[in-house]
Amino acid sequence: MQMTAEEKEISMDTPAKTATRDIYIPSERKSVSGGGKPHVVAKDFSIFYGDFEAVKKVNADILSKYVTAIIGPSGCGKSTFLRAINRMNDLIPSCHTTGTLRFDGEDIYGKLTDEVLLRKKIGMVFQKPNPFPKSIFDNIAYGPRLHGMNDKKQLAEVVEKSLRKAALWDEVSDRLERNALGLSGGQQQRLCVARTLAVEPEILLLDEPTSALDPKATAKIEDLIQELRGSYTIMIVTHNMQQASRVSDYTMFFYEGTLVEHAGTSQLFTNPRDRMTEDYITGRFS
């Protein structure tokens, strides 16, 4: 079975922007309380679009409460892998998987898995901000209401708590009833993070969350990731080598659907085990 043009487009990552290849190595990071246990475990996990194998037999442990960056050239399968973790790829008719992918020991693709509950526990923020055409308040309250929360006082508390976690409360607290589409791009992206946090996920998936933002807004998102680190397991797809080195504890490097290397970020950027990893992070190919 061959992929349609639309499915091929969906399976490929957004083309990388031209960027410097100077690598910034972060200083030693503080320890994470309660972290270190595998939160997501992939074993011989593959993803297909028809007959096309987009992700090939990945074996990896994603550790709880740490930040894991996923890097690699366009079309390498990094976003496809990320989307598989909360089953966003189910929306593509020809997509199917082999092997296993587990979350807290449970098979993500098991027959008894509740996809709605799974996506509550594993939230996702996309490349482009996608606020609903509703008020700021209703954007954040949408998820809790969907899951049965109707008490006005409780909803107000959740909205404030989520906006504070997303470092947005001080900027919007006096205009919660205004349309969220009136926010700046960076504010909209933080709103999307707050909307995800409102349903209290365990894992936060970020698919190139700053690629459409200016440097100032990008810095705020990176600061936010550091604030959330230790409270959530975070996975971020990025084309930006410096961003990966700044925000992550661990890095996964994909090439043509294969997980080439998965290591601590400092180790991967300073002493990669695989020659292909070294060639990529030093800009010999992109």
From Swiss-Prot:
Signal peptide: none annotated. It is found in: Cell inner membrane. SMART domains: AAA (SM00382). One of its GO terms (biological process) is phosphate ion transmembrane transport. It holds the Pfam family ABC_tran. Keywords: ATP-binding, Cell inner membrane, Cell membrane, Membrane, Nucleotide-binding, Phosphate transport, Translocase, Transport. One of its GO terms (molecular function) is ATP binding. SUPFAM superfamilies: P-loop containing nucleoside triphosphate hydrolases. One of its GO terms (cellular component) is plasma membrane. Disulfide bonds: none annotated. Its EC number is 7.3.2.1. ATP binds at residues 72-79. The complex is composed of two ATP-binding proteins (PstB), two transmembrane proteins (PstC and PstA) and a solute-binding protein (PstS). This is Phosphate import ATP-binding protein PstB. It comes from Chlorobium luteolum (strain DSM 273 / BCRC 81028 / 2530) (Pelodictyon luteolum).
